[in-house]
Every structure is written in C-alpha cells, then in structure tokens.
Amino acid sequence: MKYTIIENRHLTGATWLMRLRGDTSGISKPGQFVNVAVDGCFLRRPISICDWDDSTILLAYDVVGEGTEKMSKMLPPQELDILCPLGNGFDISVPSERPVLLGGGIGTAPLYGLAKALMNKGIQPAVVLGFASKERAVLHDLFVDLGLPVYMATVDGSLGTKGFVTDAYKEAGLDADYFYACGPSPMLRALCDVMPVSGQLSLE
C-alpha cells in the first residue's frame, strides 16, 4: 500500500522522524509495526509505529544501513510502499493502576503510542528511558509534553542516572504494578531478572 511522506526530519545522531499519510484503519494496538519497501533493497525494513491518527502514521527510525540511509534522503511528497500494520502490539487490557514504560534507544518509539493509549483509559504511566549518551537521547520530550513523569538513564552519565534503564528504575523508587518494555535484547533480559512484577516485552 502506498503512503505519502508529509514530514521526514533529522532528530539527533542517527535518528529520524517520518510522518506519512495513508490508510491507518487496520492499526488496532500500540506496539505494532510496518514493513517499508525501499527502492534498490531486496528486504523490507521493519519499523515500529510511534503514533498514529485517522490518516497519518509517525515512524522513528535509526539510519543503520543502505535502506534507512535512502529513507533519510526522501522528501515530501514522495511515496513509500508499506505493509501496515504488522505484529500483535501491546495488550492494554491487562488490569493495572501503576504501569511503567521502559524503553531503550529507538525502542522508545512504540512506547509513545502506548502511553497515549493508556492515558485514554485514564491511566498515567511512569516512563523510564535509557540511551548511550545525552546526544543519542530521543523522543523523551514527547512523553514530557504528555505530562508524564520521565526518568532517564545514560551509559556515560551525561543525562539522568548513570547506567541503564534498570538503574534508573531502581533510583526512581517507583512502585509499579505492571511494566511494558521495548528495547535491545540485553536490556529486556536484564529487566526480566530485576523487575518484581509481570509485564510485556517487545524487541526494538
């Protein structure tokens, strides 16, 4: 299906933000993703849906290879062939009053749509995000704009707690009764070891 680019801008480091106009009627849950076809590349690129409305989707992506490099050069009103939506997404029907959202790197992206979905149910989640450094921290301002408590961790200590998402969670002293997490495999494994409550995991 064809989607029209209406915005494609650089955020920081290797991260870009792209907004597209097209059919979003199939998107039913936060945490779903799309597969993007890029001219000259055999494989489609899987990218998490950051946010969506009745006619647009918002994607945050890192430039890590030929396909995403080509995406970063595209301008409105170019079109992309996209399979949308894919994946099971997060189940927000799980009873929870004090959930925490835990994101690492570009895995932060789908948690934004998740935060908005929870808020629409009257639930105010806490947000804990981890990055390599202050320069690579992305999208945290979106959660701040929602009025949510946001706790940060960076490996080099340049922003927030020095260390990882798990360190920032412990330092924040949050009393969460459920968690949702998206990020790299090592982060998710660490969370499974330290989180005292059950939750849902999604690979970035």
Residues covered by each model-derived region:
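FNR/FR-type flavoprotein reductase catalytic core
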Residues: 66-204
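Ferredoxin-reductase
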Residues: 2-78
